[in-house]
């Protein structure tokens, strides 16, 4: 029995930045591939704190609403253009007056995926992950895709593979599920990466490298076997290396169209924390990154 669809489909949070424009386009394409609705959301943050406190003019709220409507309208236009007239896509939009992070977390509980730009208009530098994106990848009730406006230029991007990091944790099993689904919908290869050392080999005296490598390769093959039976249309390549996971994933992402990681790995303490590998990949990869989460 297939699981029931969530009411919001793919949700894109927009704020008028270049990154959110890119997110609207990517989210629309993903929603069209899934044949589910796209919901464009802009949250007007009426609770703006200053020090010392200062009064805002009465027209402030009107200006915020007008700007919000323009942001939503532009994002909807970009989303429809990204999909094209020959593909069917149901697009809804919401303008919400509230606090951005709690609102988006609540919406995520009824979404198949949330898509956000890597940094918003308030970002100090494009190398930083925006505060809303950073919070959502820690707290959302569904997978979160983070999109850059300056994605790396990849030859023939539509045929580039999907990349997934696997470390044997339950969360990486969820990432594997998301990655197979995305690769199947795109009709591309899946590259499964297992980098099994968080330290340099020279720091591990007496290590039987060949034995560990062989065991790691066997473990990855076993992890993937069931998924390959479920998705026989997805060609799979396995990469098993003695390397730091984040470094290898970022390196391999240069030739991928999408990277999928778990929200935290074997060392993750709780669902509220973002693992060091996921955090590093989100900041360093220049292609879309999905952080696999669930409610």
Swiss-Prot record:
Entry's induction text:
A member of the dormancy regulon. Induced in response to reduced oxygen tension (hypoxia) (at protein level), low levels of nitric oxide (NO) and carbon monoxide (CO). It is hoped that this regulon will give insight into the latent, or dormant phase of infection.
Chain positions recorded as ATP 1 binding sites:
13, 117-123, 131-132
The family database entries (Gene3D superfamilies) matched by this protein are listed as: HUPs
**GO biological process terms on file:** response to antibiotic; response to hypoxia
GO CC: one term? plasma membrane
Does this UniProt record's set of keywords contain ATP-binding? yes
The keyword Nucleotide-binding is annotated on this UniProt entry: yes
Protein role: Probably involved in aminoglycosides resistance and virulence. Overexpression increases resistance to the aminoglycosides amikacin (AK) and kanamycin (KM).
Q: What is this protein called?
A: Universal stress protein Rv2005c
Source organism: Mycobacterium tuberculosis (strain ATCC 25618 / H37Rv)
């Amino acid at each position: 029995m297939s699981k029931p669809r969530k009411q919001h489909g793919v949700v894109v949070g927009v704020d008028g930045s270049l990154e959110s424009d890119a997110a609207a386009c990517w989210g629309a394409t993903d929603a069209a591939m899934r044949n589910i609705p796209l919901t464009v959301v802009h949250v007007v943050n009426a609770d703006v704190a200053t020090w010392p406190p200062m009064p805002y003019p009465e027209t402030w709220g009107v200006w915020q609403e007008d700007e919000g409507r323009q942001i939503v309208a532009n994002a909807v236009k970009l989303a429809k253009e990204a999909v094209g007239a020959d593909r069917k896509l149901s697009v809804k939009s919401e303008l919400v007056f509230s606090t951005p992070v709690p609102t988006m977390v609540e919406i995520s509980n009824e979404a198949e995926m949330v898509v956000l730009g890597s940094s918003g208009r308030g970002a100090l530098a494009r190398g930083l992950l925006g505060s809303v994106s950073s919070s959502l990848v820690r707290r959302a009730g569904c997978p979160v895709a983070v999109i850059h406006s300056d994605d790396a230029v990849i030859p023939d991007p539509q045929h580039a593979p999907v990349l997934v990091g696997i470390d044997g944790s339950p969360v990486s099993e969820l990432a594997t599920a998301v990655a197979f689904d995305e690769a199947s919908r795109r009709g591309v290869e899946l590259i499964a990466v297992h980098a099994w050392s968080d330290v340099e080999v020279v720091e591990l005296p007496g290590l039987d490298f060949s034995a560990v490598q062989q065991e790691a390769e066997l473990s990855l093959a076993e992890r993937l076997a069931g998924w390959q039976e479920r998705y026989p249309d997805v060609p799979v390549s396995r990469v098993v290396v003695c390397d730091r996971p984040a470094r290898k994933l970022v390196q391999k992402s240069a030739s991928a169209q999408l990277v999928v990681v778990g929200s935290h790995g074997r060392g993750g303490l709780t669902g509220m924390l973002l693992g060091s590998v996921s955090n590093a990949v989100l900041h360093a990869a220049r292609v879309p990154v999905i952080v696999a989460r669930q409610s």
